[in-house]
Amino acid sequence: MAIPHPSSLIPPGASRREDLRLVTGAGRYTSDWNLPGQLHAAFMRADRAHAEIVRIDASKALAHPGVKAVLTGDDARAAGFKSLPNAISSPGKNGQPMVKPHYPVLASGRVRFVGEPVAMVVADTAAAAEDARDLVEVEYRDLPAAASFDAAVAPGAAQLHAEVPGNLAFEYESGDAQAVAAAFARAKHTSKLTMDSQRLIGNMLEPRACLVAYEPSSGSYSFHVPLQGVGGMRGQLAAVSGLDKGKIVIATQDVGGSFGVRGPAYPEYFAAMLAAKQLGRPVKWVGTRGESFMSDFQGRALSLTGEIALDADGKFLAIRFDDRADLGAYGAAFGSFIATRNLTVTIGGVYRVPALYARTRLAYTNTAPVSAYRGAGRPDIAYAIERLVDYAAHEHGFDPIELRRKNFIPRDAMPYKTPNAGTYDSGDFEAVMDDALKRADWKGFPKRQAQAQRAGRLRGIGIATYLEAGGGGAAPKDEVAVTFEATGAMTLYAVTHSSGQGHETVFPQIVAAVLGIDAASIRFHPRPPAAELVGNGTGGSRGALGTGSAFHVLGNKLIELARPHAAAKLGVPESGLGYSKGKFHAGRRSIGFIELARALAGTRPHPLDTTAEGVYGTSYPNGCHIAEVEIDPETGAAAIARYTAVDDLGHVINPVLVEGQVHGGVVQGAGQVFGEQAVYDPDTGQLLTGSFMDYVMPRAGWLREIEVHDHPVPTPTNTLGAKGVGESGCSGSLPALVNATIDALRPLGITHLDMPYTPARVWAAIKSVNRDS
């Protein structure tokens, strides 16, 4: 029988079941957990960007009351820890591999960025550990710092790693350089623009922390740690420590924000493992906000120079990019992958472009390592493409809307194979744009602009027709499991972990919708009951299309698994048994699924306990975002006047969760456009934006008027037809808001500014053109 799609069965207003627990303070984050006899850790961190470690004197710290140990890089090296992981696997230019210098648990011989952990103090109390940390004395021999890509690759620059001459880690190519060059040679119009996607700091609500206990009889460790997925974190901890994954048990419950920053295993976690083993007691570390600013892996840090070639009618002939990526001091986790594969997978955007090419150079600098931040490269390339298209339209006299329309990949061309070997599964880009134009009242903008002008404000409108790649993951498949209780209630399991996405709500809803039962009888737990499940964590906009699709398969499997038991209970052959609305039925006789599960509970393991799996590839969420921005020319202050988002996310399972994800992504994009930037002193490498006094976060009042609408074109790549939503808001908002801001400034002669558009930067640009005129 046909099983109704879950999206047709979940009530439109279905709320998040975890919210009441979290907003009333009943959540349990890593810092809320304690173990008997636990010790507390504090880290002494580098106060300079680049220096040799001449000597570490921990004698005063060790003499401080309550201190149990002070560990340094020598101790970590003696313990045999391997380098922290780096995910890059793609070959570089001419097949050259990336140079990956050792990333130590604690600095050994040299410090390479402000905030790098140098020593760990372990004491009876957190206060004692923090006091003793300040007593650790380190003698340094200062070295010149290179705090940016340009400084790092300049002739004579200070070398961060002996094995990386010139600090250039890698050069990556994608596409056909010769075909692109030929297209540019015959083009009627060309445009070129350099766009910076500045370095950002994740600033999750919950700072990083860990609680580690060692069990000597089994040689195993138990962890409480903020993460994005049990499988990924366990794999990294095992790889660096040299342990079997079965020796690492993770018991995390709630996680307060992630944005990609939680995915990697950090040095502090391994140092805590070492201390817990050596001292025979659990070790707890809770980072401060200042430590997060300095030592959390950061995001973006890209500069993209884009060029586009057009014929006389405005048809795109080729696009090419020359990109520069700042990796920070080490190749951390996903940083190099983001700047290469992730940055180029959607290089053509939503457009039919015959020839594509990108070159990316990656350099080590004396700054915090760079890894994933919401979107992980895809918002950067979406911003660059949409900004470049808008720039070319105005430079060569094309209407920005019609130029896009002329070059869209049509719906009937799907699946569409791109010139750089990607395949877009589905989409209707023109229809999505037309939907957005109507909802945003694009034609009514001149009236609103005139009203703003009469009030002394500059008003602009910007559009972005973005494309995202959702569903990336390192695991070969997504496995899920279910167990049943005596009451017939069930618990779902997967290794993905929520940091605000609503897993406790949506995964039970999917299974309940397939079974036709109340979701209240189902709960979700992000850890398997016994055997390890294989699967991807929360990241890459994968939750619904990967884990969610596996739960959809599980729901259907449960019906078939229960069928012979239902037939036996009803005394009918399986062939005569139907299933609908949560019940098996044969004629007038029926038995409910929960009733059947309850009746089978006497057998252990429960006959319906089972697993399901699926292999789900990439899908391509897309959409059209339209923003209107007003600027006060006297102060340079910009305000978002209207915002309309129309997104093709495939089948929408829970509209409430989707709207929240889009809102959050748009606000994070607004943060990057109008305020956020991690700034390092170019001479010393000191972090100048190390607190909320200096680092501008988005404000609630920035986005008062936002409309979110769905325009679903289901994907065939997974059983739910879902495309993913977590990072789409960032990918759409960056170019839409930038294009709107530049549109407001264009009458003054300003055609481009780099982000962030702070009042000071916008005001300076306005004054500059006023002086020139």
PLM feature segments, named:
Residues 12, 18-21, 87-101, 167-210, ...:
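Glycine-rich loop/linker segments at domain edges
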Residues 1-165, 278, 631:
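Flexible, low-hydrophobicity surface segments
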Residues 258-280, 284-286, 503-511:
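Thiamine diphosphate
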Residues 64, 73-74, 87, 96, ...:
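C-terminal catalytic domains of large/alpha subunits in multi-subunit enzymes
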Residues 226-228, 470-491:
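Active-site-adjacent "gating/activation" loops or surface patches in catalytic cores
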Residues 108, 206-211, 303, 460, ...:
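Short glycine-rich loop/turn motifs
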Residues 109-111, 244-252, 277-288, 292-293:
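Conserved catalytic cysteine-centered active-site region
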